[in-house]
Amino acid sequence: MASKPRMPMTPSAPDISRLLQQLSLQMEKDPGLPLAWLEGHRQDPNLMAALKGASADVPVAAVLTCYELILRQDLIAAGHAIEKHRRPDDPLQVNILLDGLFFAACRDFIRASQLLVSVVNRHKGSLFIWQKMLTLCLNAGYYSQGIDWYQKAIALSGWGAAARFNLMELGSALYALDYQFERAIAIRREELALQMQRPPASPAAKSSDFNVAKTWQALTAVVDLLEGHGMRPFPTAGTLLGWWREGAILNNDKDLDVALMPADSLDLARKIMLAQVRYIAAPMSLNSNSYSCFFDRVTQVTVDLLQFWDAGEKLGYGWLLPGKYRAQSRVLHFDRFDLLRDHWQGHEFWRPDDPDHFLTQMYGPWRAPDPHFDSCAGVPNLQAMTEMVQATVYNQLVSCVSRGNYAKAMALIVSLRDHNDDHPVLGRMEIWLRKNLQNQC
């Protein structure tokens, strides 16, 4: 398998011809390379302007134009562009690749998978095409098929450490969503071993994508919708923590957390939300009897909707897995509580009648922010460290190491060890992290 060609740098406008020549050469070796390059550079306005001005007679320019429209989700324009630039001779199967990516964006997963299978069989050494194939399986819920394809991909010789790591990211997700948590954990441990062979990552800059106003809009929208159907949704977890500690939504919260009491129906809430054009079921979320994840198209915010259930003298909360997988669930127990009506920033919400006690059960000493808190396995009221919980902590650990957040990674290792995970890779990773934490300082 050929090594990955070096990517050209972002050009100034006069350099666009030379850039397109380089990308054309790359496309002849691997039609996925120019598309992967575009994904990394499409936020550059100079580049986009230069590509728009490029001649449509240059095949790679037409391909990039089509793919940029797909990435932008301008699917009507993308469909027209793909047909306009379709070439009768297509030895590299670029037309088929674009068609597959287009149908994947349209969520026509059956047609997309048929097309991408054809292309990946023609270009077995293309990391980009394998990634798109495996991502499609994740989005479509084709987990068993995705695992088969992952095994084929990872077995190929010639992948470098970075490429293997990228494939493993997708493979571990496929196994986890197929409830094969032990295998997902094993892959994550392999990823940690690979990370230690790579140069240390610089701490990632804080994302500027978070928008408090849009997140607030998303919260009030989902609460008003469900209340309009007689339910009593209320902020929970990080969203309640922001309300009670900061008086505002936390600026580092990645999603909204909304809960229902046992008397309300999560199934009905799902139907109500999905009947709205505004919401879609979030892809790549674990199938659970007590948890659903939605994407708000208007605000671009993710909404986690969870349901409490009766657990004897307590109330259960978390990710309750279906059927034979229930023993692997992530379960938290809360003392029973009632809901009260209260005001937050001029809006009325339901909330637990004793938020202090609720948050203490979930976070321990919650009044002082702890940037390294393990919100998955570090919560005081977690009932058991199941394989699903362990797999989730490993997901977070790999992510923290990748982003250079070594202090949080150390805290996650401590959490795993507190739950009797003494795998050797954790010891090696701890030494590696300590060394690189000193270098960061």
Indicate where each model-derived feature is located.
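Conserved catalytic core of two-metal-ion nucleotidyltransferases
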Residues: 208-223, 227, 273-352, 357-361, ...
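Active-site nucleotide-donor binding segment shared across nucleotidyl transfer reactions
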Residues: 223-256, 263
